[in-house]
Amino acid sequence: MTEAENRVTLGFEAEVKQLLHLMIHSLYGNKEIFLRELISNASDAADKLRFSALGNDALYEGDSRLRVRIEFDKAARTLSISDNGIGMTREEVQHNIGTIARSGTRHFFESLTGDEAKDSQLIGQFGVGFYSAFIVADKVVLETRKAGVPAEEGARWESSGEGSYTLETLTRPERGTRVTLHLREGEDEFLDGWKLRAIIRKFSDHISLPIEMKRETGEPKEGEEAPAEVWETVNSASALWAKNRDEITDEAYDEFYKHVSHDFQEPLARVHSRVEGTNEYTLLLYIPKHAPFDLWDRDSKRGVKLYVRKVFIMEDSDKLMPRYLRFVRGVIDSDSLPLNVSREILQENKQLEKIRGGAVKKVLGLLEDLANNEPEKYQAFWKEFGQVLKEGLIEDFANKDRLAKLLRFSSTHTDSEEQTVTLDEYVSRMKEGQDKIYFVSAESFGAARNSPHLEIFRKKDIEVLLLSDRIDEWLVSYLTEYEGKPLQSVARGDLDLGKLEGEEEKAEAAAEKEAFAPLTERLKKALEAKVNDVRLSHRLTDSPACLISESYGMSRTMERIMKSAGQNIPGSKPILEINPHHGLIARLNTEADQTRFQDLASLLLDQAVLAEGGQLDDPAEFVHKLNGLLQSLL
């Protein structure tokens, strides 16, 4: 390969250029974090080598003492962070550093506001890693070689962070990665050994890998030999989770969270526990304050790291946490699993299943503690992760009852979009004689709150849960009852209020049904292509009509959700309910002109579709008929 073929200049993805610009301008006030991020990357590289070497000891290449080294050169104005971890191939360098191959990237950039304070928080949630070097450097050089490949297959990457980078192959005897920062003018504080040591102890003291710096001895006197280089370990280099809880400060806990999560903010809550017995393990788990941008990527592997006797094994969240707890971050360290455990063995490992089950119980216990003792914190959690936690009712039957108590809903009692109502609170407010938990589902809070199906419930002051999250339709198909009380949709099947309806009301309804039987039959015939039946409604007090589903059929909301997702759902016809006390229905009951009756019936059905948040099959026809009706009134 010629030099021209070996050395190539490539452009960053547009997202990388935007991220670099944002970091330099938004994170400068917290610029020390670049060192934490680069040390964290080096630590991850060492973890990956340890795991790979479990099956191939030759990857250590005779050097199994893993460490991170920090060096600076005042004359050259450079700061270097090097490790002897797994390293990268040239192709991996191009993929990992030239692009942002991460779910949620587009949503991240759409969320940026232009407000530096807010954007810096968003950037912290997204995680910047390697790119943070450009906060203090105007040029960054990375040299690396992957463990187990020949020295001639190293790679060198260089960029000034302005839109492009160069990449070339080089000979590198040392395994691992070295990142050299050419510091900007005014960043001299990062050329001070004492300052660097202070930053390391502040941000990275908890890392179990030794972080080393050369002992500073000063310039030798004339005629004296320069003293031999001595590397000193700066951090405590012990696994934080292995310490007793009373030995760990809140600050140390928070910094460890930032290390394992690559989040810039402190966590919302944590649990640190040691489980002893036949299956011994330690866990240190955190709940973030904010949802990561890949929260809805169910295939994301980031989450909880598994260690065996302080040796990193994997970061594969669904092996250690169910998918509905994929937001949890932290570590689990087992004393009982074999050190040479493989991912294949872990698939069916009973010990790991018990560890997973125990970890889930600890997380649910932490959430219960927040809900009972720190409701404001729990409400902050619910706002970020509530929709994900709802998946647990579908996935985790064993913990279904515990999860049900953690649910929060909007309801007609609070009349607020904020989901604060528990099922226990709902049950405590149930009317005398009420034996069901009522809910209405819609595709938005506004549509649920203004649903015509609520009218009789508002009149009788009966609370109804307002469900508008996309997962809610699946939720209520699994959560069919709570504390012996069935959940009942107010928009499905015949409405039976039982003891909430007096005998006089029931007698009046029976009389109305008989009196309006000719009209319901006439409407049913006029709309037979679009509705399955026409009935008198006991739900409506103000609206002329509404649509309902059969008791055991798919709900109207679920049909729309499935169709919007591209699912081929067999068409089903709804039931049209009419309000016998509404003026429009009274007018229809006396309409003799069949053409006019047909138009009014179509308009009645179409407005019922619109009232529930649906879409018309033929909006133009609706407008045409409505205009005709309006003209006839002039």
UniProtKB/Swiss-Prot annotation:
It is found in: Cytoplasm. Residues 1-343 are annotated as: A. GO terms for cellular component: cytoplasm. One of its GO terms (molecular function) is ATP-dependent protein folding chaperone. InterPro entries: HATPase_C_sf, Heat_shock_protein_90_CS, HSP90_C, Hsp90_fam, Hsp90_N, Ribosomal_Su5_D2-typ_SF. The keyword Acyltransferase does not apply. Its main location: cytoplasm. It comes from the Bacteria. Keywords: ATP-binding, Chaperone, Cytoplasm, Nucleotide-binding, Stress response. Signal peptide: none annotated. PROSITE patterns: HSP90. Residues 561-634 are annotated as: C. Residues 344-560 are annotated as: B. SMART domains: HATPase_c. SUPFAM superfamilies: ATPase domain of HSP90 chaperone/DNA topoisomerase II/histidine kinase, HSP90 C-terminal domain, Ribosomal protein S5 domain 2-like. Homodimer. Molecular chaperone. Has ATPase activity. Belongs to the heat shock protein 90 family. NCBIfam families: PRK05218.1. PANTHER family: HEAT SHOCK PROTEIN 90 FAMILY MEMBER. This is Chaperone protein HtpG. The gene is htpG.
